[in-house]
């Protein structure tokens, strides 16, 4: 981080601690051994997506980013690469609102800002051909414009 920690609130400091712990836990996959895939080009369209898959294809982290939020748009199908077709995977994601949205009480009138978790199972073929379904509502909860989602994918 390149920021002045003395200017952060206690909730922001806790968020930084969680992010550092996540990076330490997944450093081997993200920085050393993982195969990197660009799933959606950041230079074309409104979306961007990347994933990192372990060499033995038992673990992956996928990241989805949007530029601008579309109101009343359909679901997104975020297609992955590099998984084993016949392997069953558990996909998890934290769909809780961003810290900024949680602390903005005006938004509570229009959005359900309770914490929300995604967890389901799918085969690699499904994840690569059909994709992870992403609801626009979840992107609005995460921040709307410039929202992002991080998916943890583990073989069962």
Can you describe what each PLM-predicted range is?
Residues 138-156:
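Generic C-terminus detector
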Residues 1-102, 106, 110-134, 139-143:
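Active-site-proximal substrate-binding groove within the catalytic cores of carbohydrate-active enzymes
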